[in-house]
């Protein structure tokens, strides 16, 4: 990805986070990151979702922290480069939402 990531300012957070909060993303307590848990009909759909997200994450060179058990996928996003939330996390979370909606 071009350019160094910067940690979102309070003003940027106020502008960028409400749409994600509205669909269930939460800020983690004690860490500058966002988190959401997704539920799918079965393991195949959960794995298909993860595959689509993984392909986009690789293109963006920005990878989620995630955990999968059967039909549940837990995702945490934070940018290591700036030790906190960046626009990269917001963009990836928005893409993840689009994929999740298309898989339900």
Curated annotation (Swiss-Prot):
GO terms for cellular component: cytoplasm; nucleus. It is found in: Cytoplasm; Nucleus. It catalyses: (4aS,6R)-4a-hydroxy-L-erythro-5,6,7,8-tetrahydrobiopterin = (6R)-L-erythro-6,7-dihydrobiopterin + H2O. GO terms for molecular function: 4-alpha-hydroxytetrahydrobiopterin dehydratase activity; identical protein binding; phenylalanine 4-monooxygenase activity; transcription coactivator activity. One of its GO terms (biological process) is regulation of protein binding. Its EC number is 4.2.1.96. Pfam families: Pterin_4a (PF01329). The modification N-acetylalanine is found at residue 2. Substrate binds at residues 61-63, 78-81. Keywords: Acetylation, Activator, Cytoplasm, Lyase, Nucleus, Tetrahydrobiopterin biosynthesis, Transcription, Transcription regulation. PANTHER family: PTERIN-4-ALPHA-CARBINOLAMINE DEHYDRATASE. Belongs to the pterin-4-alpha-carbinolamine dehydratase family. Homotetramer and homodimer. Heterotetramer with HNF1A; formed by a dimer of dimers. Interacts with HNF1B (via HNF-p1 domain); the interaction increases HNF1B transactivation activity. Involved in tetrahydrobiopterin biosynthesis. Seems to both prevent the formation of 7-pterins and accelerate the formation of quinonoid-BH2. Coactivator for HNF1A-dependent transcription. Regulates the dimerization of homeodomain protein HNF1A and enhances its transcriptional activity. Also acts as a coactivator for HNF1B-dependent transcription. This is Pterin-4-alpha-carbinolamine dehydratase. It comes from Rattus norvegicus.
């Amino acid at each position: 990805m071009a350019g160094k990531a910067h940690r979102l300012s309070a003003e940027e957070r106020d502008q960028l986070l409400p749409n994600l909060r509205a669909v269930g993303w939460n800020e983690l307590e004690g860490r500058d990151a966002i988190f959401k848990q997704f539920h799918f009909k079965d393991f195949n759909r959960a794995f298909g979702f993860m595959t689509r997200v993984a392909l986009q994450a690789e293109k963006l060179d920005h990878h989620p922290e995630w955990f999968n058990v059967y039909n549940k996928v837990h995702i945490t996003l934070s940018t290591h480069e700036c030790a906190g939330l960046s626009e990269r996390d917001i963009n990836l979370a928005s893409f993840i939402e689009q994929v999740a909606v298309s898989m339900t």
